[in-house]
């Protein structure tokens, strides 16, 4: 509907998966078996059951912190050339790690999150909007309330299951601007 109403640009949505390490795969399988056993014991997926909830939470956290996620994201950034990227990570630690790696690879990037004071956040945002930076890395600080029409690429390195959050994040780069023909969302 939004594309037909001409409020967003044409875009390509690329689904990519960072494979887990063998150790992570094994842990994932163990968590899954434990979840299945617990669900069978309590007679189903009762999300009010604290042990079941914790097993599911810990499995999801392990996936979110997979060792290959950041290197894979860097590889995708290098492979898919765009004028400017917004990279949304799972947490501040991942944002810092991703930013450090891509700066070493020659990208002009900065972090935008609540660890920075307001002046530094504003400076990083303005530098991105002006084109002085070509990558802005954040976790949840850019989820809602920010328009970033300058960006023509978005990389979502977090594994949110919230449809609303995914739509909000994609919307950061889909706004129409005079110089943008299309956008890429990874």
Give names to the regions the model predicted:
Residues 84-91, 112:
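Conserved RecA-like ASCE P-loop NTPase motor core of nucleic-acid helicases/translocases
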Residues 24, 69, 94, 162-165:
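Short phosphate-engaging motifs
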Residues 29, 96-103:
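Class I S-adenosyl-L-methionine
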Residues 1-82:
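Interdomain helical connector at the RecA1-RecA2 junction of SF1/SF2 helicase-like NTPases
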Residues 81-84, 133-134:
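Pre-Walker A (Motif I) flank of P-loop NTPase domains
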Residues 103, 108-186:
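Conserved RecA-like P-loop NTPase helicase motor core
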Residues 66, 91-92:
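Helix N-cap/beta->alpha junction signal
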